[in-house]
A protein has these predicted regions:
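Active-site cores of enzymes that catalyze phosphoryl transfer or operate on phosphate-rich substrates
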Residues: 58-105
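Active-site loop/lid in soluble adenylation, ligation, and acyl-transfer enzymes
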Residues: 54
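DNA-dependent DNA polymerase catalytic subunits
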Residues: 1-31, 35-51, 81, 85, ...
């Protein structure tokens, strides 16, 4: 868990790369071989070479000019408050990269699409190095974003003492990066930069789970997988919520308070790519993960978290959470089409009347296997939900809590039940 994390992203990164580096089927001059691009160039007008080796002439291409117009139209739509038009232009602009990598497009080419992604990686890498030279630590990055902690490292400690407000000023940091990036692109590639890094948000606390089966900082985080507590007033639970934190396993303690009044802590928690926002996990798993995040962001002691987990599991085995055990998965083809293997939702669908064997299948794992909701004839398999829903989620928290699953759940997962 990290404190004070700033999130930066590039506005329309791939379209901006196409515009900046003149990436276009007509300007493409081949791959550089033996020091020269296969398509030739002139000494007066040296070509632009992408990190993947693709070379582009500087004569303006069609796609960059189209994107210039679309950027202008989108800016006009945003100025008018026309959210629909702005969204349409955004989708169209982002599709340019997709069609260049799609076989069905007559202008597609792996070198063109590869040039865009390689420039993206080069630019994100340059920004990461620049920020770290300033004393910040880049925790995580995806296609067009960087997550930066400002309260780490000796350089940051020195800056924190000298100018704490400036250290947390995302707009100021953006300005420094953009000015330096512009100089780098002009000096290195001789282009007119059209790339703009934006300050998106700040998290008071930020959780980056490790990869399943991995450990260590290098293996933390999955693509789009993280959770953060959006910046706001200091999060402290109210006495009433605190008293019921363990008594109601499903998250009764989401209410929090400050000296200014009461607010809902859970509304400030953003989750991306984790089980809490995935439909193929049960409500039991969703609420369990959100509650663990709340306790983590509130900096609750390990004993309190263990107590919450214990009461949750006891409630599960008492049958008090049966309404939260439903899986939901779409049936995308007929049951008879599943020949090699039969997934649980297909087995459940096979028990339904033929007229209902379609669309979203809601089912429960019972002691007799998966059964569709409304047609359940056997008790739920609580061991399944403990081992497949609760324990995998808890495993992501063991490193930050400096414990293990045995300590959280008891040996075998349910030691206290016997």
């Amino acid at each position: 868990v990290f404190d004070e994390v700033l999130v930066f992203d590039f506005q329309s990164l791939y379209p901006s790369i196409i515009r900046t580096f003149n990436i276009d089927p007509l300007s493409y001059a081949g791959q550089r071989r033996g020091g020269e691009p296969t398509g030739g160039s002139t000494a007066q007008e040296p070509p632009i070479r992408a990190p993947n080796g693709a070379v582009f002439r500087r004569q303006p291409g069609i796609l960059p000019e189209l994107l210039d117009r679309f950027f202008e139209r989108r800016a006009e739509a945003q100025a008018k408050g026309d959210a629909v038009a702005s969204f349409v232009y955004k989708i169209i602009m982002n599709s340019f990269y997709g069609v260049l990598g799609a076989r069905g497009c007559r202008f597609a080419g792996s070198d063109l699409a590869g040039a865009i992604t390689s420039f993206g990686q080069r630019i994100l890498g340059w920004c990461k190095d620049f920020l770290e030279d300033l004393g910040y630590t880049v925790l995580y990055g995806d296609t067009d974003s960087l997550f930066v902690t400002v309260l780490a490292g000796p350089a940051a400690a020195e800056a924190r003492t000298a100018a704490p407000a400036l250290l947390l000023d995302g707009q100021e940091i953006c300005g420094r990066v953009n000015r330096a990036l512009e100089e780098y692109l002009v000096e290195t590639y001789g282009v007119e930069p059209r790339l703009t890094l934006r300050f998106e948000k700040r998290y008071d606390r930020f959780f980056l789970p490790p990869l399943r089966g991995g450990s260590g900082q290098a293996e933390k985080g999955r693509a789009k997988g993280y959770a953060g507590l959006l910046a706001g007033e200091e999060a402290t639970e109210s006495p009433a919520a605190d008293a019921h934190a363990g008594a109601t396993p499903t998250g009764n303690a989401s209410a929090a308070t400050t000296s200014a009044g009461t607010f809902d802590l859970r509304k400030r928690i953003e989750v991306r790519g984790m089980e809490a926002v995935r439909r193929d996990w049960t409500d039991l798993a969703h609420e369990f993960q959100l509650r663990l995040l709340e306790l983590l962001f509130l900096k609750r002691p390990l004993e309190e978290i263990q107590g919450y987990i214990r009461e949750l599991v006891e409630a599960l085995y008492r049958g008090e959470l049966d309404d939260k055990l439903v899986y939901r998965k779409a049936l995308r083809k007929s049951i008879s089409a599943y020949t090699r293997n039969t997934p649980p939702h297909v087995k459940a669908a096979a028990l339904l009347p033929r007229s209902e064997q379609r669309g979203l299948i809601r089912y429960v794992i019972t002691r007799e296997g998966p059964q569709p909701e409304g047609w359940i004839s056997a008790p739920p398999d609580y061991d399944h939900y403990l081992e497949r829903q609760l324990m995998p989620i808890a495993s992501a928290f063991t490193e930050v809590l400096k414990t293990d699953l045995e300590a959280l759940f008891g040996r075998g997962g349910q030691l206290w039940l016997f």
